[in-house]
């Protein structure tokens, strides 16, 4: 009797395993169709990577490819992605033509307005002897909360080395970059930045423009140049000389 029950149990187990195998085979046969539909319907398939232009950095063999992205319309004419501002890039590829290695500048969400690796190269001054950095003007924060990055959001000054490594922000957060200059003699970057003084989520002509500086290659934070007492003195002098008379 014991052998009989053992035989029955084994038979049931074998039948169950065979049914499971059949179900898995049926699912595998169905999956190619569903996977194909998923691929066709995936909006990423309508994206067209665009490396329109590239340049070499200081005869180093390292090339930089600013990235744009085109999108093919669906059959019904709809688009799946937000339109980027003109003359903006969403990332940059660094390609070493000697080693065939390549990398992205960063995987963070950003809008690159421009980049500069020849800054300070005028008057026959070799830029590679001036600094080993590339400078970028970048938007990373949706400051006005419109759910997209545009030139209405603050522009920050970023730097990296000439191979795209150590990409980091050097201008203060929530301040809009107005102007900047690399000072070779002090190895500093001096920048003027706008503060949204009236808290209207816009950077306009009435906002305060502040001056900051950072010494490169020192690992220090960006500091405001003019101290609070000096700025208060400027306001007192202006109030004395330019206040409207009643």
Task: Cite the ranges covered by each PLM segment.
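Acidic, glycine-anchored loop motifs typical of Ca2+
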Residues: 144-151, 196-205
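Extracellular-facing segments of soluble proteins and assemblies that are Gly/Ser/Thr-biased and enriched
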Residues: 95-158
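C-terminal motif of bacterial Sec signal peptides marking the signal peptidase cleavage site
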Residues: 13-16
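Surface loop/turn motifs at the tips and blade-to-blade linkers of beta-strand repeat domains
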Residues: 106-109, 170-174
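Bacterial Sec signal peptide processing site at the extreme N-terminus
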Residues: 18-36
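Beta-propeller blade signature
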Residues: 89-96, 150-163, 206-219
